[in-house]
């Protein structure tokens, strides 16, 4: 397979009929923080557009034969062959209500019609049963990467140290908990998801090392920070998940190998 990714490019200034390729030197203002983070991590072709079908066509022109649409379940203008629904295992479905009264974008019963359910950091615990048994994934983090150099250090090197930690993601407490669970003494500061960081946001007078998420790092690498680190995380997936996806692709005639 030659995979590619399409995304809305949240936070980017981009017209509805415009398509942009995400490059390793793209700016967050051009393509959004999450697409740029994905590009730097996986390297596959990535295009952003509010009209995702246009981004898909751009991937097709590059020879991609599998398209992953980032955060695309509710983008019904784009047809799909396989749906993978990922839940945050800590927050799950909250109070079960739809936005704005709760965290859900659709009723929980929607999972009866999705192909795969993946729980991030927990097991399935609802009486509503998905089409297939839910699978588990866990985020693993073991080393810190310097924001402005190639240096990396084991996270354990910072155990029992005081650090500043910032997070502008959907669930910042997960990041802070990871640091605390590794023995770090955290002075935390929360920002909104997709926060456009400024120099003032990342300057602290206490002289402590500054730690951030990988997503926030793509927005802070423009600043000249001498003691700043970010924490890359990797998803440890169930061995069964890849096999099930391949089986599903075969059943849809996408794979004959």
Predicted features, each with a name:
Residues 76-257:
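ATP-dependent carboxylate-amine ligase
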């Amino acid at each position: 397979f030659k995979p590619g990714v399409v995304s809305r490019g949240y936070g980017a200034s981009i017209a509805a009929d415009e398509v942009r390729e995400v490059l390793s030197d793209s700016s967050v203002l051009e393509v959004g923080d999450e697409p740029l983070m994905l590009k730097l991590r996986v390297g596959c072709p990535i295009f952003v557009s509010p009209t995702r079908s246009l981004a898909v066509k751009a991937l097709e022109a590059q020879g991609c034969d599998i398209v992953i649409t980032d955060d695309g379940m509710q983008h019904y203008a784009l047809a799909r062959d396989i749906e993978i629904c990922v839940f945050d295992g800590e927050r799950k479905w909250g109070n079960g209500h739809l936005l704005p009264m709760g965290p859900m974008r659709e009723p929980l019963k929607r999972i009866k019609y999705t192909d795969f359910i993946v729980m991030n950091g927990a097991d399935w615990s609802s009486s509503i049963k998905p089409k297939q048994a839910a699978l588990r994934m866990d985020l693993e983090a073991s080393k810190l990467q310097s924001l402005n150099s190639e240096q990396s250090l084991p996270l354990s090197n910072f155990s029992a140290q005081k650090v500043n930690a910032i997070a502008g993601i959907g669930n910042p407490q997960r990041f802070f908990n990871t640091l605390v669970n590794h023995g770090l003494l955290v002075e935390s500061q929360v920002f909104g998801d997709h926060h456009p960081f400024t120099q003032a946001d990342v300057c602290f007078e206490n002289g402590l090392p500054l730690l951030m998420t990988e997503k926030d790092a793509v927005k802070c690498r423009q600043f000249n920070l001498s003691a700043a680190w970010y924490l890359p995380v990797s998803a440890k997936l169930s061995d069964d998940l890849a096999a099930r996806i391949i089986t599903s692709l075969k059943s849809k005639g996408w794979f004959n190998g």
